[in-house]
């Protein structure tokens, strides 16, 4: 694979459904067995439903904002600059409790069809606020 720079303006956001308050943009797509890297943008008060990844650990780097992760029976608060690793099979969710958007850099150690599933969702461009935040990092 040749190196490639992605500029914020080139990113395509997606929502899984029209009810979602989260946009995800794929930065590097795995082939099912390799990792996928993506940007998550969560609106205030958004909450991702509980789920698990049976063959993938998930890694989160908080770029901006505050987040509460719920992993098994534990609540963990994190903010910009913090990193969290969720082991495979761990039931987890996350919520944005803050009044501002939450930005996460996320890695799934094994794609498990995630990127393909996301691409079947609703294309939703990143807006001017998102692009300004990404440019300021």
Model-derived regions, located:
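A generic "binding-loop/recognition-motif" signal
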Residues: 44, 55-56, 74, 90-91, ...
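Conserved short histidine dyad/triad with adjacent acidic residue
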Residues: 38-53
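Glycine- and acidic-residue-biased ligand/ion/polar-headgroup-sensing regions
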Residues: 55-57, 62-67
């Amino acid at each position: 694979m040749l190196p490639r720079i992605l500029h914020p303006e080139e990113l395509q956001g997606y929502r899984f459904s029209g009810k979602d308050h989260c946009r995800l943009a794929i930065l590097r797509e795995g082939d099912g067995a390799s990792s996928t890297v993506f940007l998550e943008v969560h609106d205030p008060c958004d909450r991702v439903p509980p789920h698990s990844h049976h063959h993938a650990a998930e890694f989160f780097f908080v770029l901006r904002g505050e987040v509460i992760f719920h992993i098994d029976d534990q609540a963990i608060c994190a903010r910009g600059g913090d990193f969290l690793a969720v082991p495979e099979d761990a039931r987890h969710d996350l919520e944005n409790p803050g009044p501002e958007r939450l930005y996460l850099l996320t890695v799934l150690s094994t794609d498990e069809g995630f990127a393909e599933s996301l691409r079947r969702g609703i294309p939703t461009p990143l807006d001017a606020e998102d692009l300004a935040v990404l440019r300021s990092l």
